[in-house]
Amino acid sequence: MAAAGGERQLDGQKPGPPHLQQPGDRPAVPGRAEAFLNFTSMHGVQPILKRIRELSQQQLDGAQVPHLQWFRDVAALESPAGLPLREFPFAVYLITGNAGSGKSTCVQTINEVLDCVVTGATRIAAQNMYAKLSGAFLSRPINTIFHEFGFRGNHVQAQLGQYPYTLTSNPASLEDLQRRDLTYYWEVILDLTKRALAASGGEELRNEFRALAALERTLGLAEGALTRLAPATHGALPAFTRSNVIVIDEAGLLGRHLLTAVVYCWWMINALYHTPQYAARLRPVLVCVGSPTQTASLESTFEHQKLRCSVRQSENVLTYLICNRTLREYARLSYSWAIFINNKRCVEHEFGNLMKVLEYGLPITEEHMQFVDRFVVPENYITNPANLPGWTRLFSSHKEVSAYMAKLHAYLKVTREGEFVVFTLPVLTFVSVKEFDEYRRLTHQPGLTIEKWLTANASRITNYSQSQDQDAGHMRCEVHSKQQLVVARNDVTYVLNSQIAVTARLRKLVFGFSGTFRAFEAVLRDDSFVKTQGETSVEFAYRFLSRLIFSGLISFYNFLQRPGLDATQRTLAYARMGELTAEILSLRPKSSGVPTQASVMADAGAPGERAFDFKQLGPRDGGPDDFPDDDLDVIFAGLDEQQLDVFYCHYTPGEPETTAAVHTQFALLKRAFLGRFRILQELFGEAFEVAPFSTYVDNVIFRGCEMLTGSPRGGLMSVALQTDNYTLMGYTYARVFAFADELRRRHATANVAELLEEAPLPYVVLRDQHGFMSVVNTNISEFVESIDSTELAMAINADYGISSKLAMTITRSQGLSLDKVAICFTPGNLRLNSAYVAMSRTTSSEFLRMNLNPLRERHERDDVISEHILSALRDPNVVIVY
C-alpha cells in the first residue's frame, strides 16, 4: 500500500473534478477526508478507516468521564490498597497479520486520513514507522508510546508487582482488571500522576486550551477554530491532548499492564488540560498493530544479592485483548479487528504458505517439513566466517552472537582482507565512588568490587541490549580521586566497511558524500535528502547541498583525466562543459547592461572574497612571454584552456543570508551539476555514471581507518536513526563543537565532561544508504539503580551506539527485512514463534540457511492464540485484507 496511486470518496462526499497530479507534487488531502491508496488494497483498508473514525467520535455519558479530582486523590495515596474501583473507558482496534503483510504500511494511510498520534512499542518500531511516514511526506518525529505517556529514565529500574493483588470477581470485570494493572505498575503510575499534577503549578486546570477558547468567544469564531491549533501555538503540549486516536506499532512487545497505563495517562492528561476532546466526552481509541504469534513481552528482574538478571515472559497486549473474555466483549473485538494476510516481503508461493501455517497455528504436514529441509546445512558451516560472506547470522542469545563476532574478527585478522579491516576503539564507563559505596551498604555487600559489579551489570549499564554482542577486550580500571570516579576502559573490535546500525537516536554532522555520479544525481533530482531533514529548516539542507555541489563540480574534470577514454569524446566533453559554464555564468558578451542572476550571486559573496581572474595570466609588460612569474602561473601553465574549470575562476559561493538567495544559489549550482552530468552521460554512458564521486565541505583524508580533516564546519546537523542502514567508514579525532557543548551541558555536574575533554573519545564516521558521510556523536547513557525506593546514580557509559549487522539475535531482527539470512537455533529451547520470526526476515528463500529444521525438532507452540485467530478468520465481521 502506498500513499499515492488511487482515490476514493469517503463519507458520501460529492465527487469533484479529478486531481491532475504532477510529478513530485504532494497529493492533496482537503480536510483530511480523502485517502490515497494502492488500488489492490483500497477496498480492504477503507472499512478500517471508517470503523476507527466511528469509535473516535462516540460520546460517553457524563458519569463515565473520570474527573481531575480522582487523579488528585490517587496522588495522595501511599499504597495502591486504597485504589477505588473505577472504569477508564477506552476503545480498541486491532490490526494483526503475518510477517511482511503490510500492517505497518497501513498506518501510513491512517496517519494521513485521521488526526492521530502514531507511536511505536520500541525505539526501533517508532523509527521504522517514521521512515515509512517520511518516505511519502514530511513527518513529525515518531516517539515510543512510553515517551508519550510520560515514562522517564528513572522508571526503567522500577520494581513492578511489589503489591500482590487478587481479582475480586470471576469472571473479572473491566474495573477489576484495570485496578490489577494499576497495582502492578503502581510505582510508575504514582510518579507519573504526581509529576503531571505538580506541573500544573497548583492551579485547578492548565490554561492553554481555556485561553484559546476565551479568545474564540471574544472574536466570535466558531467553536474549535483556535483550540484545534493549540499544538501549534503551544509546542510543549503532550501529544495525547492532540487526538484521542493512539496508534501503537509492534504492540505485541508490550506487557498487558501497559494497556491500562496508556488509557489512565490519556484520561489524566486530558482532564488536567480540559481539552476539547475531554469536554466532548470522547474516549481514547487504541489502534494496536502487530502480530501476537511473532512477538512476546519480556520482563527482567535484577537480584542484587546474586548479581543476576532474570528474564521472564509475560502476557502481551495483543494476547491480552484477544484471549481475555472480558476485554474481548468490552471492545466488541469482532467489529474492531482487521487481519492482513499474505507475506509481501517474500512473495514465493510455497514459502508464503509455510508462513501462514506458522502464523495461524495450522497443522504442520510432512510436505512442510520437507520444504524446510532444503534450507538445512551443518551448524559449523554457518558459524565459519569463511562461508556465506555478506550474510546476516541470527542466533538465539547474545552470548552466541558475541562468540561468532570474536571468531569473525580473528578470521579477518589472519586473512587480511583488503576491504574489511579490523580495528579497536575504546569504550568508557564512569562509576561514582560515592554511589557505589552506598550501593554496597544498602545491599549488605561490603566486599563487592567495582570490576565484579561492572561484569554483572554490563547488559544494564548501556542503553541498548546489543552491547552484549560486541567483541570486547579485557576491562581495565583507573581511579580518579579528584573527580571521585572510577573509569573502566574496554577496547571493542569493529570491522571497517561493515554494515552496522545505530542503537539510539544520536546527533550526527553530515559533512560529505561518497558514492557514484549517478547516486548523487538521483539525490538532487528527487530532493530525497531534503525530505529526510525533518529535524531542521530546509534552508540549511539546501545550503549544505550547495557546498557539496560546488566542491564536487571539479570531479567531472577529474573523470576526464582517467586513462583509456576516447580522445575525441574527451575533447568534445571539455568544449561542451566550457560552453555550459559560459551559459550558466553569463560569460559571453551581452549588449544589455542589466546584471544577470549569476553576476548578482557572485557579487553577493562575503566581504573580501573575490573570484580569481584567470584573464590576468597573459604576458606582462617587461617580462618574457614563456616564463611564469609566480607559483600560480606554474600551476595553470600545465593546463590548456579547455582543461581549466573556469567555473571556479568566475564564481564564489559566499553565504546567502535570505531564503530566496539560498534557493537561487542552489538552483544555479544544481543546474551546473545536472548539465555536466548529462554531457558526460551522453558521451561515456554507464562507465561515467558508476564512476566514484566524492565531495566534502572541507579537505578530507582517509589514512587507514582514521579520517583526517581540518574542520567539519559547514556540515549539516541531523539525527542518526535506528532504521537507517549505515556502513562503518572509520573514526576521527576531529572535534565537533556542537557535540562538545552538548556534553558539557548535560554531564558537567558529574565531572564526566571534564575527563572526556582531557582524553576525548573518537567519533565514528558512517556512510548512510544514500551515500552521505557523517560524524556521529558519542552515545552517553546514564545508569540509575533503584533499591528500596532509593535511587543511586551509579554510572555513566560512553560508547559509539552502534551494533553490527553481520550477526544479531533473533529478537533484535524483529521488524527487519534481510537479504541473506543464516540462522543458528538452540535445539534444547526451541519456540516455534521465534523460528517464525527468524525465517520471515528473508526477502527470498533462495538466501535462507539454518542449522536444523525447527518443524522436526521438539518445540513449544502457542496454540491458544492461534485458535482465537482462526476463529476470527471465520468471523464475517472481522476485516480480512489480502
Curated annotation (Swiss-Prot):
The keyword Hydrolase applies. GO terms for cellular component: host cell nucleus. Changing residue 690 to G: In strain: Nonneuroinvasive mutant HF10. Its EC number is 3.6.4.-. It is an enzyme of class 3 (hydrolase). Residues 1-29 are annotated as: Disordered. It comes from the Viruses. It is found in: Host nucleus. One of its GO terms (molecular function) is helicase activity. Its main location: host cell. GO terms for biological process: bidirectional double-stranded viral DNA replication; DNA replication. ATP binds at residues 97-104. Keywords: ATP-binding, DNA replication, Helicase, Host nucleus, Hydrolase, Nucleotide-binding. Changing residue 662 to I: In strain: Nonneuroinvasive mutant HF10. Associates with the primase and the primase-associated factor to form the helicase-primase complex. Belongs to the herpesviridae helicase family. Component of the helicase/primase complex. Unwinds the DNA at the replication forks and generates single-stranded DNA for both leading and lagging strand synthesis. The primase synthesizes short RNA primers on the lagging strand that the polymerase elongates using dNTPs. Possesses helicase-like motifs and therefore may act as the helicase subunit of the complex. This is DNA replication helicase. It comes from Human herpesvirus 1 (strain 17). The gene is HELI.
